[in-house]
Swiss-Prot record:
GO molecular function: metal ion binding; protein serine/threonine phosphatase activity
Subcellular location(s) per record: Nucleus
CDD domains on file: PP2Cc
Record's protein name: Probable protein phosphatase 2C 30
Organism: Oryza sativa subsp. japonica
Residue ranges, compositional bias (Polar residues): 330-343
Subunit structure: Interacts with PYL5 and SAPK2. Binding to PYL5 is dependent on the presence of abscisic acid (ABA). Interacts with PYL3, PYL5 and PYL9. Binding to PYL5 and PYL9 is dependent on the presence of ABA.
Record: residues binding Mn(2+) 2: D111, D298, D390
Annotated positions binding Mn(2+) 1: D111, G112
A Pfam family recorded for this sequence: PP2C
Length: 404
């Protein structure tokens, strides 16, 4: 590694002479460029040393192609917001864990009811449970990608529900700031929805339990990746009746006139009518068509359609792309002195352009994160302007490929 670094520095210091300019300024700028080159070479070497040690869930045990290896280091670009809105209490929770598994990113929205502690626990624990279950499933033979992820998500939701039920029965104390500690010792009326997405090199995995929702924008079309679990959904209504439960229409369809969803984490007082089984969907990613993914609580979806939400996010991301292109296009904005200095400090050995490109990529990635956050905020403002009565939580994930 040291020899490579020395060769880069030696090669760059002996090549290329440009027009006359301030030698002090040139020397200082040259030193900065050499430091950047060293950093880029060192980072590349570290990536090469660790890439062979990475454990992947995708691939089924075969050798990864070069394209798949490139996708492993895809950077997560996302933004989110969560606001109380017109509610007295904030009961939503959001989770974003880029790189929680090698080459995979985790995102989740959890909409609590009764209190916040189940949603908070989901936000803190769900990704950890998925990591455990994914590790246990990594050695499963004879299962395709969809079946493996379906099993991982079903077991993860069951474990999360068991933890919530244990908390409601007093086996685990509620959080110190939880208002349930001032109520009954058994807080079995508390629960949460859960919609989670795992973004991998080749697939998007979405698991949903409740009425939070995931929507994919592909080729300009809004594609829902989850279906709300409402008590009056025909298959859910049939399941509840078969279990001996009733759906009463009181301010909308509710299980026994109380809960406005038919599946949730927690809510032990309504089991077995309200279950925690997620519906899992595994979508193969399509480069050039997949644009972004939206996860949000029903505080958004009650007042904003899938299509309108996708149009808002697309406008934000396109606006950001135009700003980025305007910044990166022209050397016409540089003075003659700046242009000549840049040309002098970028000999044709390739290393300086890599360093400059690395810095530019970091700026572009930061701009894309900012655009996703702005899109999430704009959706939240739209929901509030349309008089949503619930907490609003939104996660926006950019699906356009950009590798590290």
């Amino acid at each position: 590694m040291a020899e490579i670094c020395c060769e880069v520095v030696a090669g760059s210091s002996s090549e290329g002479k440009g027009p006359e300019c301030d030698t002090g300024s040139r020397a200082a700028r040259r030193r900065r460029m050499e430091i950047r080159r060293l950093r880029v070479v060192a980072e590349r070497g570290a990536e090469e040393e660790t890439s062979g040690k990475r454990r992947r869930l995708d691939g089924g045990g075969g050798e990864a192609s070069t394209d798949e290896e490139d996708r492993e280091v895809e950077r997560a670009r996302y933004g989110f917001t969560s606001v109380c809105g017109r509610r007295r209490d904030m009961e939503d929770s959001v989770s974003a864990c880029p790189g929680f598994l090698p080459g995979h990113h985790f995102f989740g929205v959890f909409d609590g009811h009764g209190c916040s502690h189940v949603a908070t626990s989901c936000g803190q624990r769900m990704h950890e449970i998925v990591v455990d279950e994914a590790g246990a499933a990594a050695g499963s033979a004879g299962l395709d990608e969809e079946a493996r992820w379906r099993g991982v998500m079903e077991r993860s939701f069951a474990r999360m529900d068991a933890e919530a039920v244990a908390s409601s029965r007093g086996s685990v104390a509620p959080a110190p700031t939880c208002r349930c500690e001032m109520q009954l010792p058994k807080c079995d009326h508390v629960g949460s929805t859960a919609v989670v997405a795992v973004l991998g090199p080749r697939h998007v995995v979405v698991a949903n339990c409740g009425d939070s929702r995931a929507v994919l924008c592909r080729g300009g079309a809004a594609i829902p990746l989850s279906c709300d679990h409402k008590p009056d959904r025909p298959d859910e209504l049939e399941r509840i009746h078969a279990a001996g439960g009733r759906v009463i229409f009181w301010d909308g369809a509710r299980v026994f006139g109380m809960l406005a969803m038919s599946r949730a984490i927690g809510d032990s007082y309504l089991k077995p009518y309200v279950i925690c089984d997620p519906e899992v969907r595994v979508m193969e990613r399509k480069d050039g068509e997949d644009e972004f993914l939206i996860l949000a609580s029903d505080g958004l979806w009650d007042v904003v359609s899938n299509e309108v939400a996708c149009n808002v996010v697309r406008a934000c991301l396109r606006s950001s792309g135009r700003r980025e292109r305007n910044r990166s296009s022209p050397t016409s904005n540089l003075s003659p002195r700046q242009s000549s200095s840049s040309g002098d400090e970028a000999p044709n050995d390739g290393a300086p352009s890599a360093a400059a490109g690395s810095e530019s990529d970091e700026e572009s990635a930061a701009e894309e994160d900012k655009a996703c956050a702005e899109a999430a905020v704009l959706l939240t403002k739209l929901a509030l302007a349309r008089q949503t009565s619930d907490n609003v939580s939104v996660v926006v994930v950019n699906l356009r490929r950009r590798k590290l």
